[in-house]
Amino acid sequence: DAHVDRAEAAATAADAAFQALITDAAWGHVWARGTIPLRERSMLTIALLAGLGNDHELALHIRATANTGASEADVMEALLHVAVYAGIPRANHAIAIAKNTFAAMKDAR
């Protein structure tokens, strides 16, 4: 994955151990498991990031939907769940991020 490759290349002595940990845990174990299809794993991740208010990572994972099979409609549906289970303000902010991210993705095509 290009994102992982860029993150590993940008690692310094200060954060190399952290980068190795997240690469191994997230990409080497969780994302590599075949028990949940990538589309659903992507939706779970987006909902969790939105609910937790992790804006930078949310935009990153929305951009990654181009590779996971999750559509814009899928993401917006997941964010409706965020509104109910994590709160309207979190979902409102996440929807704004999603709209901006999808618009930028369309402009880049």
Where are the regions that the model predicts?
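Acidic, glycine/proline-rich low-complexity segments that act as flexible tails and inter-domain linkers
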Residues: 1-39, 67, 92-109
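N-terminal alpha-helical segment
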Residues: 23, 40-42, 58, 75
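Short alpha-helix boundary/capping elements
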Residues: 26, 48-54, 87
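Helical "substrate-binding/catalytic lid" subdomain
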Residues: 36, 40-43, 53-54
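Short, structured motif recognition centered on aromatic/hydrophobic residues
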Residues: 41-49, 79
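Mid-chain, well-packed structural core segment of small domains
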Residues: 51-76
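C-terminal structural segments of small proteins and small subunits
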Residues: 83-91
